[in-house]
From Swiss-Prot:
Binds 1 Mg(2+) ion per subunit. The modification Phosphoserine is found at residue 101. Activated by phosphorylation. It catalyses: alpha-D-glucosamine 1-phosphate = D-glucosamine 6-phosphate. Mg(2+) binds at residues 101, 240, 242, 244. Belongs to the phosphohexose mutase family. This is Phosphoglucosamine mutase. Its cofactor is Mg(2+).
Amino acid sequence: MGKYFGTDGVRGEANVELTPELAFKLGRFGGYVLSQHETERPKVFVARDTRISGEMLESALIAGLLSVGIEVYKLGVLATPGVSYLVRTEKASAGVMISASHNPALDNGIKFFGNDGFKLADDQELEIEALLDAPEDTLPRPSAEGLGTLVDYPEGLRKYEKFLVTTGTDLSGMTVALDTANGAASVSARDVFLDLNAEIAVIGEKPNGLNINDGVGSTHPEQLQELVKETGADLGLAFDGDSDRLIAVDETGEIVDGDRIMFIIGKYLSEKGLLAHNTIVTTVMSNLGFHKALDKQGINKAITAVGDRYVVEEMRSSGYNLGGEQSGHVIIMDYNTTGDGQLTAIQLAKVMKETGKSLSELAAEVTIYPQKLVNIRVENSMKDRAMEVPAIANIIAKMEDEMAGNGRILVRPSGTEPLLRVMAEAPTDAEVDYYVDTIADVVRTEIGCDN
């Protein structure tokens, strides 16, 4: 990752780290880089989630885009995957989403999509960063008819909603509880599920600029669990702030995470011969129970580093059409180029409707192993070399021998902090505690910062 761009665009505390000045420059330089090869006036879609800082950053970003002659289509509040969809289908030069996803309201972010609807490649981000760090701005400054124009485009939301509905099936007789996280899905999820003829109950649908992801949404599903039980809903669906991820709740109030959602949809596609290469792409953090369920079903898996960016890269390079993360980012490439919480929710409900099975029945095929993750502060120079320390390598090997194939250990460095992450999965909580704590003690002794 670069100096400004992380794995999911540029992020920071709004008006402190991610300032209007930086947003203007990102619009100006990003717009220039992404439209250099256009033969006609470049067209860029811009959307945001419901954060109080969204309109401030949107105004600055759009000013930057207009300053290099871009025709800007202002979408207002819209889910991140909606931007990706519109860029592709309306043949835009690029798209920009202003959101910090599942982060709290004080944060915000800016991420770009190329004309293919995918997030930017590293070389494009580095080109933008080079312009940001240049001693002076030498880009063209058009005037009069050379300046960009701004078009309000509320039709974009309607087009995205119609697209979502076309991917589903009639949900008559099904009751769906929705948690739209006081975020981007609050403008669309209700309408989409009503159009699919579901009975609905909704929470997290009253954004005020400050309550996005606050006790609601995919990272806080507790209220949704209660709503499902209170209403007798067939399933609950929780989105995050920009609606690119989904966590579900079954009819008993139990959480159904990204691993189980991928398995349910993947098995359905596999049985219909529609799962490309009969493979699901997942990350190293997916639960061992998920892997065992895939093996039992005869479905292959491709494993990547943590981050939906890497999942998408593997899907594109190898021609896979389903992938995602335990956290609820699920990419269904037949329909869209990025994680799409509402799309995934519709596909999950479709599987339930077409199989006649409850969500708890479908999810029961994946036995989730207890998992524990411990972060250990270590010397930054050692976090990538931990396995070179004999005592650490030996204790990991010893624990894996004791597991005898009925558990999993993952030790990996943090990408952004001086931390070593120690994770284990095993059949019982007691076993997980034993494996993680034993390894963590050795790591602290050998390379921990407190020594």
